[in-house]
From Swiss-Prot:
<comment type="pathway">
    <text>Amine and polyamine metabolism; carnitine metabolism.</text>
</comment>
<dbReference type="InterPro" id="IPR025110">
    <property type="entry name" value="AMP-bd_C"/>
</dbReference>
<dbReference type="GO" id="GO:0031956">
    <property type="term" value="F:medium-chain fatty acid-CoA ligase activity"/>
</dbReference>
<dbReference type="Pfam" id="PF13193">
    <property type="entry name" value="AMP-binding_C"/>
</dbReference>
<protein>
    <recommendedName>
        <fullName>Crotonobetaine/carnitine--CoA ligase</fullName>
        <ecNumber>6.2.1.48</ecNumber>
    </recommendedName>
</protein>
<dbReference type="GO" id="GO:0009437">
    <property type="term" value="P:carnitine metabolic process"/>
</dbReference>
<dbReference type="InterPro" id="IPR020845">
    <property type="entry name" value="AMP-binding_CS"/>
</dbReference>
<comment type="similarity">
    <text>Belongs to the ATP-dependent AMP-binding enzyme family.</text>
</comment>
<keyword id="KW-0436">Ligase</keyword>
<dbReference type="GO" id="GO:0006631">
    <property type="term" value="P:fatty acid metabolic process"/>
</dbReference>
<dbReference type="Pfam" id="PF00501">
    <property type="entry name" value="AMP-binding"/>
</dbReference>
<dbReference type="InterPro" id="IPR000873">
    <property type="entry name" value="AMP-dep_synth/lig_dom"/>
</dbReference>
<dbReference type="GO" id="GO:0051108">
    <property type="term" value="F:carnitine-CoA ligase activity"/>
</dbReference>
<dbReference type="InterPro" id="IPR042099">
    <property type="entry name" value="ANL_N_sf"/>
</dbReference>
<comment type="function">
    <text>Catalyzes the transfer of CoA to carnitine, generating the initial carnitinyl-CoA needed for the CaiB reaction cycle. Also has activity toward crotonobetaine and gamma-butyrobetaine.</text>
</comment>
<dbReference type="InterPro" id="IPR023456">
    <property type="entry name" value="CaiC"/>
</dbReference>
<dbReference type="InterPro" id="IPR045851">
    <property type="entry name" value="AMP-bd_C_sf"/>
</dbReference>
Length: 517
């Protein structure tokens, strides 16, 4: 079944411009408060100009172009401008440093880079010291260094016509993007995403939160991340809604932005919810138009209830990963919600729990969450130039091994337990990091928490807790361990405590555990 009607991204944008014309498509707010607005017609013209810019710089179908940008209009222009000419976007996490950025450039084979002056010195060094295929850099800033091989993105774009100059034949099976995974435990892998993947993601995510063309979807998630692209942007555009892209998250500013833009849909991760809850209560906390808050793992029931009560919202759970493109398990429109369940499998997917021998498990038993989809259509196509890694997680019949543990109840509701790599083996017992973190997070003095396993000669692994305290608080080891002993089984109580000012996180809010080992 062809859900998207054979429509690639070039056709999508031409149709959106025709149908929605002067309706607002995109609003971007910078950290400095500068706001840019584009109608569907204007945005399609900017996308065409950007496509023509790339063509004049020698980019052709199949070429890879890297983007190292914070949330900004240029990211959207480049993403779809490249797609229109059959080129491939390689977004780079804007928080990565030289070594990691160079590694992605090398492994993606990108020949052109779009970035800002903030990151340019790093790429100067990469060009001098690393072997890459990079031959040109476009900077989005007005002021340019007097260097060869560097151009002004804005100046070149504005010189281009608003109609497309180069339109090679496209297929929905063509690669549109190579998105490198966050690599919190190992080197990132390049997830190959097709035009079909992105078009399907738009329809699916719009269905998931029942989007209409009068909706306003606001996100602070980074544009180089799958959530922003496929759960937010593609959903909003596919429905003809308005997409609001905020440059960076600020707990102090977020709720005001929700109110200012009259957002009806937004998305949150646990870090956002916890930082919003420590903001001073306001009489305007419930003055908003939000219908749904898309939510991604993991939060204790106490935290969830407190957030929903204070702000008068409900959470729409969604479970997925870069490889699944969208939240393939989640709450369904007009369906019952069963916290702490992560929901049921969405349309076009199958899900089941399997044991260590790849056999399905009955309801109630914990095993690996496995998802069945169609590679290159409803799930990722493959890992770029890495068939061994692809074969490790993706079976020939479309079953994807997520590496997450969970269980399912009799009604098909799934429950997340933990990442397999986040299970601590302690004296013959398996201990879930997420379970402990949810318990410890309820301590009134603790703002942020992560637990990890460290080598122990007697018990396989010992448990160490890293905590960030609320401002002005102090916490003794005696108080911490007493709290743990009162709220969890003895074998789950951490052996060590370290209080820190912050925890290392990637762009999507996930703890970078390898930095805490």
């Amino acid at each position: 079944m062809d859900i998207i009607g054979g429509q690639h991204l070039r056709q999508m944008w031409d149709d959106l411009a025709d149908v929605y014309g002067h309706k607002t498509a995109l609003i971007c707010e910078s950290s400095g408060g500068v706001v840019n607005r584009y109608s569907y017609l204007e945005l399609n013209q900017e996308i065409n100009r950007t496509a023509n810019l790339f063509y004049t710089l020698g980019i052709r179908k199949g070429d890879k172009v890297a983007l190292h940008l914070d949330n900004c209009p240029e990211f959207i222009f480049c993403w779809f401008g490249l797609a229109k000419i059959g080129a491939i976007m390689v977004p780079i996490n804007a928080r990565l440093l030289r070594e990691e950025s160079a590694w992605i450039l090398q492994n993606s084979q990108a020949c052109l880079l779009v970035t800002s002056a903030q990151f340019y010195p790093m790429y100067q060094q990469i060009q001098q010291e690393d072997a890459t295929q990079l031959r040109h850099i476009c900077l989005t800033d007005v002021a340019l260094p007097a260097d060869d091989g560097v151009s002004s993105f804005t100046q070149l774009k504005n010189q281009q016509p608003a109609t497309l100059c180069y339109a090679p034949p496209l297929s929905t099976d063509d690669t549109a993007e190579i998105l490198f995974t966050s690599g919190t435990t190992s080197r990132p892998k390049g997830v190959v995403i097709t035009h079909y993947n992105l078009r399907f993601a738009g329809y699916y995510s719009a269905w998931q939160c029942a989007l209409r063309d009068d909706d306003v979807y606001l996100t602070v998630m980074p544009a180089f991340h799958i959530d922003c692209q496929c759960t937010a942007a593609m959903a909003a555009f596919s429905a003809g809604a308005t997409f609001v892209l905020v440059e960076k998250y600020s707990a102090r500013a977020f709720w005001g932005q929700v109110q200012k833009y009259r957002a009806t849909i937004t998305e949150c991760i646990p870090m956002m919810i916890r930082t919003l809850m420590v903001q001073p209560p306001s009489a305007n906390d419930r003055q908003h138009r939000l219908r749904e808050v898309m939510f991604y793992l993991n939060l204790s029931e106490q935290e969830k209830d407190a957030f929903c009560e204070r702000f008068g919202v409900r959470l729409l759970t969604s479970y997925g990963m870069t490889e699944t493109i969208v939240g393939i398990i989640g709450d369904r429109p007009s369906d019952k919600r069963r916290w702490p369940s992560i929901g049921r499998a969405g349309f076009c997917y199958e899900a089941e729990i399997r044991d260590d021998h790849n056999r399905p498990l009955p309801a109630g038993e914990i095993g690996e969450i496995c998802i069945k989809g169609v590679p290159g259509k409803t799930i990722f196509k493959e890992y770029f130039l890495n068939p061994k890694a692809t074969a490790k997680v993706l079976e020939a019949d479309g079953w994807l091994h997520t590496g997450d543990t969970g269980y399912c109840d009799e009604e098909g509701f799934f429950y997340f337990v933990d990442r397999r790599c986040n299970m601590i083996k302690r004296g013959g017992e398996n201990v879930s990091c997420v379970e402990l973190e949810n318990i410890i997070a309820t301590h009134p003095k603790i703002q942020d928490i992560v637990v990890v396993g460290i080598k122990d000669s007697i018990r396989d692994e010992a448990i160490k807790a890293f905590v960030v305290l609320n401002e002005g608080e102090t916490l003794s080891e005696e108080e911490f361990f007493r709290f743990c002993e009162q709220n969890m089984a003895k074998f789950k109580v951490p052996s060590y405590l370290e209080i820190r000012k912050d925890l290392p996180r990637n762009c999507s809010g996930k703890i970078i555990r390898k930095n805490l080992k």
